[in-house]
Amino acid sequence: MAREPGVFAISVVAEMVAMPAQNLRVYERHGLLEPDRTSGGTRRYSRADVERLHRIRELLAEGLNLAGIAHVLALEAEVDRLRTECARLRRR
């Protein structure tokens, strides 16, 4: 499935998720988030990025550190991938 292109500026997303823009930059540096970039290097966030930031905020509220969050997000992505694969195999 193709990823939706990013359209939101960092200031807009920071407001949408009630986080300082600096936090978004930190999450990107830690590999938790990978926004698109314009040709000039400006970050552009998609709706999927916004959803991921909401999930990051939930995990932070549960007491996880950034390494723990990265692990949880990776496991959730793997579960999604496996569910898709199972559904594909069932259709055979």
What function would you assign to each model-found segment?
Residues 59-92:
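Long, leucine- and charge-enriched amphipathic alpha-helices
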